[in-house]
Each structure stands twice: as C-alpha cells, then as structure tokens.
Amino acid sequence: MDVAAAKALGAGISVIALAGVGLGIGNIFASLIASVARNPSSRDQVFSIGILGFALTEAVALFALLIAFLILFA
C-alpha cells in the first residue's frame, strides 16, 4: 500500500466520528424541543444548556477533523 493511500484511508477512518457527532447533535436538539414543548416556561434555562451541549459535541467533531488533517498533511 502506498503511503498516500494509507494516509487517505486513515483520514477517512478518523472522520467516522462525525457520524456520531451528527447523531448526538440531533438528539440534543430533539430533547430540547421536547422539553420546551412540555414546559415552555423553562425555555431560557433549557436553551442555554442545549447550546452548551451542542458546543461540547461540536468540539468532538473539530477534534476529529483536526486529526484527519494531521494525518493527511503531516
């Protein structure tokens, strides 16, 4: 196997984490919508926690993308 092919394969495997991130973000906002539908008065508190969860989950995606770029270009 060529080195370039191994790098491309490794970068592709490291990006698989993005599928989990997409599912996680979907679950966060689905739960956010469901909780606001049940109790509209708690919207502000639940929304801030949801945005925090989104940011932390998105950080995992950025780390996976960083690893993929390091594999490809380093």
Curated annotation (Swiss-Prot):
Topology of this chain in the membrane: Multi-pass membrane protein
SUPFAM superfamilies xref list: F1F0 ATP synthase subunit C
Signal peptide segment: none
Alphabetical list of CDD domains matching this protein: ATP-synt_Fo_c_ATP5G3 (cd18182)
Locations listed in the record: Cell inner membrane
Function: F(1)F(0) ATP synthase produces ATP from ADP in the presence of a proton or sodium gradient. F-type ATPases consist of two structural domains, F(1) containing the extramembraneous catalytic core and F(0) containing the membrane proton channel, linked together by a central stalk and a peripheral stalk. During catalysis, ATP synthesis in the catalytic domain of F(1) is coupled via a rotary mechanism of the central stalk subunits to proton translocation.
Protein name (database record): ATP synthase subunit c
Organism whose genome encodes this protein: Granulibacter bethesdensis (strain ATCC BAA-1260 / CGDNIH1)
Gene (name only): atpE
